[in-house]
Amino acid sequence: MIAYNKIELEKAAKQAGFVRDTFEKVLRLKEVLKYINSDAYLREHLALKGGTAINMTIFNLPRLSVDIDLDFTPNLSKDDTQMHRKQITEQLCEYMEESGYYRSESSRYSHSLDAFLFLYQNAGGNRAVSYTHLRAHETR
């Protein structure tokens, strides 16, 4: 996990006009997105959507999104979709755990949406939560 310095974060957040803890969370989310983009399997099966996608790729909006919304993109059978979602879940959770995050028991899983909540200790020493949502669209 990247070690974020409280003083440096405070300075950068203030210059950008944001609260330090929210600013740190967005930096952490960007690292997760970099990982997803660097992995061929994840990049092939997932699409970033929602406010984070718009803010980080199209516009330079003065808004900090604090979650990641992903869509499972292949058009597969229910069984194949479930198999790939299982692999994606394992890869994402392994990366997050290796990066110092802990999966919360409040994470939720259903046939159409997985909502991962990952806990970490922020630069201020507080426990914080990172959200990742994975939507799957089973079509056959």
Which residue stretches match the model-derived regions?
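Helical scaffold of the NTase/Pol beta-like nucleotidyltransferase catalytic core
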Residues: M1-A47, Q87, Q91
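Short acidic, glycine-rich loop/turn motifs
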Residues: L119-G125
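Active-site nucleotide-donor binding segment shared across nucleotidyl transfer reactions
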Residues: N37-I68, P74
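Glycine-/proline-rich flexible loop or hinge segments
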Residues: A12-G17, I68-D79
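Metal-dependent nucleotidyltransferase catalytic core
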Residues: F72-S110
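Short alpha-helical segments and helix-capping/turn motifs at coil-helix boundaries
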Residues: E31-Y35, D114-L119
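Conserved small/polar residues in nucleotide/adenosyl-binding loops
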Residues: T132-T139
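Short, glycine/charge-rich beta-strand/loop segments that flank catalytic centers
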Residues: L48-T52, R103-F118
